[in-house]
Amino acid sequence: MTVGVSRCCRTPLSCRLPPARYASPRPARKLYKSTLAARHDPIFRDFADDPARGGLWHLRLASSNLPLILENQQPFFANGLSFIHNGDISDDRGINIVLNRAYPINQGAFLSTGGRSDSAIFFSVILEYIAFGFALDEAVAQAVRQLRQAYPKSSYNCMIQSQDQLVALCAAGREKTSPRIVEIYDEYGKGEKAHDYRVMRYRDVQDRDGKPSGVVVASSGFEQNESDGWKVLENDQMIVASNRTGEYHVRSI
């Protein structure tokens, strides 16, 4: 499971500080990608300890039959947006969308992502809808509707972040993990963790005074107990959060 990190940072303030402390100047963005597994990457701990008001972490396996190369590592970054995707956009035969030459892709948007994968294609479709004038959350929803016309059973779970906003979407096409995904996990000796591959959960974040100040959204891979405040993000729902105030709401697509 490789590591990719994008953080919206403003040292020395922490992402858990009260919203009123977030003032200009605008925070700097840090982007790091590696093909190393996070547990073996010496930079991982540095990023984990780095204060930030918002961030995306992508510690996932690669899509089926796609190469483990730096260009495909996430987060992707384009037009001031960071994007991560947990899914495999393939048809019932397991043929990935990157091999579908007939699928219409905006080459300019695709090249701007810097990637070559199905996730890069997904991001490029979102970028198109943003260029059409849609708000960030609705651009994500429109992109999923478009891709589902050709790939209805694929997973479109994703997160996208701007300087001001975070959108996290759960949009799986199957109730159970497909055998193909289980096989990929088995290859890495992680087959027992494939059952909740498409599950996303979230919980509130509190500041030092115990007041709500943000939200954490995560996919599977570590314990997310209800007793600790974790709630399931239902299928076809998204969280839309402010990176400035920490306020968020849940909407359907």
Which positions does each model-derived feature cover?
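N-terminal segments that mediate ammonia production and transfer
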Residues: 1-253
